Amino acid sequence: SDNKQIKRFFALDSRAYEEGALSVKVKELLGLVSSTVLRCNDCITYHIINCVKEGVTSEEFFEAMNVALIVGGSIIIPHLRKAVERFEECLQLVEDGKELPI
């Protein structure tokens, strides 16, 4: 894209998830919780894939989802269900030695 604002935003987004005082893994969990509270299914999927790539365990995933549920309330339950399905699908892909999407 020739749009400088979009390019700058994409660069900022990439840099926000780089290793720093917080690990990439923690930042992806934060992104996942935020995306769940905001009810953005595409964003949830994106962060789940990155969480799995970063080695997030089931225990870590469900603990993060508990935070999302408290912050977002019961309205996020449909998104939470999809997130659990997607997380389990991604874990299965890894277990089967297959590549994760994106």
Where is each model-derived feature located?
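Acidic, glycine/proline-rich low-complexity segments that act as flexible tails and inter-domain linkers
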Residues: 1-26, 76-102
